[in-house]
């Protein structure tokens, strides 16, 4: 690439590679805790989770889709369709419009959202003063902190 640029343009160019979705997207996931489940919301029940558009704004901004799995274990094989909504009381805070989850999904269950390794943390915010969650790394031999969980006080730390 570099020699091709130098042959066709000036040598003032600097070649950089941005890993992006193709390389790192599937390296990340987000864990949510299911809160209330609203059965009276039309054609499907809504699960409210302890995160939302502040930790993953991509669905609200441009409709990105993420698969969701209930990883709490000992669940029935039979599934039903749920909508999964965030905690921000915004009409756009819909993380997954149609998630096929076990019919016995309950408050307190852990839901795993996949393909969140690219841009998700970089786009996260403290919207509604919600602290950002912890980011961990997992290797073949250890689990380690990459970014520590914010406290509520951390969301005010830069205010004057």
What are the residue ranges of the model-derived segments?
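Alpha-helix-loop-beta-strand connector modules within alpha/beta enzyme cores
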Residues: 1-9
């Amino acid at each position: 690439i570099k020699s091709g640029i130098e042959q066709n343009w000036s040598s003032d160019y600097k070649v950089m590679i941005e890993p992006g979705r193709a390389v790192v997207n599937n390296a990340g996931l987000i864990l949510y805790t299911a809160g209330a489940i609203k059965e009276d919301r039309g054609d499907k029940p809504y699960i409210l989770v302890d995160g939302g558009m502040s930790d993953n704004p991509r669905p609200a901004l441009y409709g990105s889709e993420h698969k969701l799995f209930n990883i709490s274990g000992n669940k029935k094989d039979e599934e039903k369709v749920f909508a999964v909504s965030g905690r921000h009381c915004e009409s756009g805070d819909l993380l997954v419009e149609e998630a096929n989850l076990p019919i016995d999904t309950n408050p307190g269950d852990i839901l795993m959202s996949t393909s969140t390794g690219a841009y998700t943390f970089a786009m996260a915010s403290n919207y509604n003063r919600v602290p950002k969650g912890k980011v961990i790394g997992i290797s073949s031999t250890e689990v380690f902190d990459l970014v520590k969980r914010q406290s509520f006080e951390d969301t005010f730390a830069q205010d004057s």
